[in-house]
Amino acid sequence: GSDQQYVVALNKKDGGVAWRTDRTGEMNPNPQLKKSYGTPLILDTNGRPILYSPAADWLYTYDPNTGKELNKLNYGMLGFSIVPRPVAGHGLIYVITSFMRPQLLAIDYLSSNKPSIKWKWNRGVSNQPSAILVGDEIYFVSDSAGMVTCLDAHTGKEHWRERIGGNYSASPLQSNGRIYFHSREGKTTVIEAGKEFKVVSINQLDGQLMASAAVDDQALFLRSDKGLYRIERKRD
């Protein structure tokens, strides 16, 4: 928050505090620029579980059992109120710095004891929707104007950047080689995952889609401000 910055672990059985660790990195003195809402990840790192937690101006690593801070990586005063969930693959963690100066950072967390930035991208990066990693490509959509970018996940090289239109808060979803983008205007655009841009279908629902979609078996659940939709192919 703007007044306190810390990470806390709760006992899942009774809700009690297992540990709490304050953030230690220097931040912008403006309290509003100290906030972060990004969901942490726990990754196996050279044989041990490590908790990776994005924060304003920093990426922290902790021992998930004790809360002990292990390392922190300063990426500069680029972002605050971090919303997107980081994703991991290919020995990298992909972190979006969110508001103020949104960038996508590819952070190497396996090559040494301390994470380091391998590459970064700063064009059309989202503030709220998370990026999505599909195979060797990573995709993200801008909050406004609906610009989708596809990068090589290893190098950060751009494969394509295309406009699908609309404004976005929901994170994209992938299934069976297709990626689904849900706009605030109620439009779902489905594209083929890959190095070439190809739209498969466009569908329209009543109301705004701001929440990310959920999946159960063969059903897709979409929540708009008008209702909850279950979309599923009819079974034989």
Predicted regions, residues:
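Noncatalytic, solvent-exposed loop/strand surfaces
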Residues: 1-236
